[in-house]
Design a protein with these regions (language model features):
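Active-/binding-site microenvironments in catalytic and ligand-binding cores
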Residues: 1-124
Length: 124
């Protein structure tokens, strides 16, 4: 069971491809949106997480939605419930399955809908 108020971090293993842009993103060509290929979460997973009252969803890929998404339904589903997303997370394999305290420190950007963020996990 996922307790309400949790941050759920999705470890796809995709972080192992960083910093190789071609492997991490599916393409090394800037602006090649059609070439993007990486995993993300689906709308059903986003709905389940929202229903369980999570506060945040993080992932070790470039986006919460899969690479070729055109509608960004996972983003929209989570953000409609005021659940924030954390992308491009590193070292998820070093975290325990539960019990870590997550601290996300975003850069302040006036009027922005997103920002670079430093994420720190305190281990139990």
């Amino acid at each position: 069971r996922i307790p309400a108020g949790s941050a759920v971090l999705v470890r796809t293993g995709w972080g192992r491809y960083w910093p190789d842009r071609a492997r991490y993103l599916g393409t090394a060509k800037p602006g090649d949106v059609a070439g993007l290929r990486f995993p993300g979460i689906g709308v059903e997973a986003a709905k389940v997480l929202a229903a369980r009252g999570v506060r945040a969803v993080g992932i070790d890929t470039a986006s919460i939605d899969y690479g070729r998404s055109k509608d960004f339904i996972a983003h929209r589903t989570l953000y409609a419930e005021n659940i924030y997303g954390l992308e491009n997370l590193a070292n998820l394999e070093k975290l325990p399955p539960r019990g870590a305290t997550l601290i996300a420190l975003p850069m302040k950007i006036a009027g922005g809908s997103g920002a670079p963020v430093r994420v720190v996990a305190l281990l139990p």
